[in-house]
Regions:
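Short, basic-rich loop-to-helix N-cap that marks the start of a DNA-contacting helix
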Residues: 52-65
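Short alpha-helical DNA-recognition segment
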Residues: 29-47
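The alpha-helix within a helix-turn-helix
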Residues: 25, 36, 50, 64
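Residue-level detection of the helix-turn-helix DNA-binding "recognition helix"
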Residues: 26, 40, 51, 79
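A short, Lys/Arg-rich alpha-helix, primarily the initiator
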Residues: 2-31
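Short C-terminal boundary/hinge segments that cap the last helix of small helical domains
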Residues: 68-82
C-alpha cells in the first residue's frame, strides 16, 4: 500500500507574503533604499522580500528594529494560489 503524499493536490499550500511591509513603508513615507540603509540590509535582501522569497530571520529582526514594529506587522502567511 502506497502512502498518500503529505501535500495532497487538493490541499491549500501556504507561503509568506511581505505586502504588509510595503504598505508600512508607504505609511511611513519611506523608500526601499531608505529601509535598506536604516536596517543595514542589502539591496539583494530587499529584492528577495519583493519576490516573497525566504530571508534570514536576522534580516526580519533588523527591519522590525528599524521600523519599530513587530514581525507580524511586516509579513503574513497566506494561501498560495499558484
Amino acid at each position: 500500500m502506497l502512502k498518500e503524499s503529505m501535500f495532497d493536490k487538493t490541499e491549500a499550500h501556504m507561503k509568506i507574503s511581505y505586502k504588509k511591509l510595503w504598505k508600512l513603508l508607504i505609511d511611513k513615507e519611506m523608500m526601499k533604499k531608505d529601509l535598506a540603509e536604516k536596517a543595514n540590509i542589502s539591496s539583494a535582501s530587499i529584492a528577495k522580500l519583493g519576490r516573497n522569497e525566504n530571508v534570514n530571520t536576522d534580516i526580519l529582526l533588523r527591519i522590525c528594529e528599524a521600523l519599530e514594529c513587530d514581525v507580524s506587522d511586516i509579513m503574513e502567511v497566506v494561501e498560495d494560489t499558484d
